[in-house]
Amino acid sequence: MGKSEFELSVDRFLRLIAKDSPKTLFNPWKDVNAQFDMKSAPSIRKSNLRQYLFAHENARAILVGEAAGWAGCRFTGIPFTGENLITGDEKLEWASGRPMKRSSLAEKPYKERSATIVWGEIAG
């Protein structure tokens, strides 16, 4: 059985965001910083974003951010989402049962303050 139109759209989107960027910019879905990232970090971030999009396939609205947060999307690949919200005790409900991974080399998961605020407001 072939992929759904949604799956094909997600695949296209992930290919687009992983394209080359100017050397002065860091693209979380393509680049690795050996000081902070696992070698497979871009693949992990794309996989995390794929899982997020599949979990919200029927969403009525989306949030769009202007730039990836330095301690959130930068490591998870998911806008407004820190590593603490996809793994461990603070894992968000939609992330449970999904193969979410951290991409940072840090001992503890990165926390993005704005991510905690955004998801707190969404949860009500």
Model-derived features: positions:
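A polyanion-binding, active-site-adjacent surface
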Residues: 3-124
